[in-house]
Amino acid sequence: MLRDFKKEKEMPTEIIEKYKGQVPDEIIEIWENYGLGSFLNGYLRVINPDDYKELVEETYFRGKESIPLFVTAFADVITWQENRYIGIIFYKEEDFDIMASGMDFFFSDIYTEESFRKEFFDLKLYGKAVKRYGELEYNQSFCFVPLLGLGGKKSIDNLDKGDTLTHIYLITELVGKVGIDD
């Protein structure tokens, strides 16, 4: 199912049990067979939902109906929403989108559909960033400095590595939450 998976560690058994029936069987299978780690050349990371759940609930208008599943190399969080949709939260741009209805074609689209990858992932910039700055650690993302919402440019020259959770909290504190007016 996941090509080029680089395992970081096992998904805790209690997390697998906690989310059975709440996430698609394909996700449970990934957690059981692959664990936590990265794929798509390190662009996507399988995460422990509990590590991101509070963040998503506090910073995204659909947060209470969302279960975080993956995070991208640019700190975008991919979620399972309303037991039906795969959503993506683009914190860096204060935006969100629905990637798919159900899991049926999600993984095949990631690997085989160029239009899908172009719409939701910035693999071209990621490739340049890895060449210039090196590969990311499991808990890191490429961060725009200054933040895009504060006038930063979406450019290879404006990237730095940082802790993913810290960076998302920083974005939401300085720029704003996604779909929530404070």
Give the residues covered by each predicted segment.
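Compact, glycine/acidic-enriched structural inserts
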Residues: 87-124
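A sequence-composition feature that detects small, non-aromatic residues
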Residues: 73-75, 100, 129
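Charged, low-complexity, helix-prone segments enriched in Lys/Glu/Asp/Gln
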Residues: 51-59, 108-110, 123-126
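A surface-exposed partner-binding patch
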Residues: 1-88, 140-182
